[in-house]
């Protein structure tokens, strides 16, 4: 289990409270699909993913990105209990969707990049360290059910 200090929790929740989940979620998933094109195979039902502009403008990418980031909000509310928080999602992604758990790490790294671009000077090294710790812990929690 990962332990978050009060300062780390404050750094994470401070930025989270300013985030537009719908916009940022679509941007995060879209960037993942553009930068790591092999991840697109998990989204065959999303239609046109043929170019960066098609991906970033795709309403299904935006909707699923919002869903992903909304569940990230659950992580922020339950930072001390991530494995339990993500147990069902881990099982779904492992047993039914067969998502490579490495993709969770990639998405976490994309999240950090997006936070840096959105928050600029507010995204200090200390804030980045707290977010890196969180996205890594979420990736581990999501990979928990994998054998």
From Swiss-Prot:
Red blood cells. Heme b binds at residues 64, 93. InterPro entries: Globin, Globin-like_sf, Globin/Proto, Hemoglobin_b, Hemoglobin_oxygen_transport. This is Hemoglobin subunit epsilon. Residues 3-147 form the Globin domain. Belongs to the globin family. Keywords: Heme, Iron, Metal-binding, Oxygen transport, Phosphoprotein, Transport. It comes from Macaca mulatta. The keyword Nucleotide-binding does not apply. The keyword Heme applies. Signal peptide: none annotated.
């Amino acid at each position: 289990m990962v332990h978050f200090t009060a300062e780390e929790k404050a750094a994470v929740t401070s930025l989270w409270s300013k985030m537009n989940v719908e916009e940022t979620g679509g941007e995060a998933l879209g960037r993942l699909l553009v930068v790591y094109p092999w991840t697109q195979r998990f989204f065959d039902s999303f239609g046109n993913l043929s170019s960066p502009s098609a991906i970033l403008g795709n309403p299904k990418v935006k909707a699923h990105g919002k869903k992903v980031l909304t569940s990230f909000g659950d992580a922020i509310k339950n930072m001390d209990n991530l494995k339990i928080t993500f147990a069902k999602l881990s099982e779904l992604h492992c047993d039914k969707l067969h998502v490579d758990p490495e993709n969770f790490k990639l998405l976490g790294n994309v999240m950090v990049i997006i936070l840096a671009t959105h928050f600029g000077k507010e995204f200090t090294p200390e804030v980045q360290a707290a977010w890196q710790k969180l996205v890594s812990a979420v990736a581990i929690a999501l990979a928990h059910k994998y054998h």
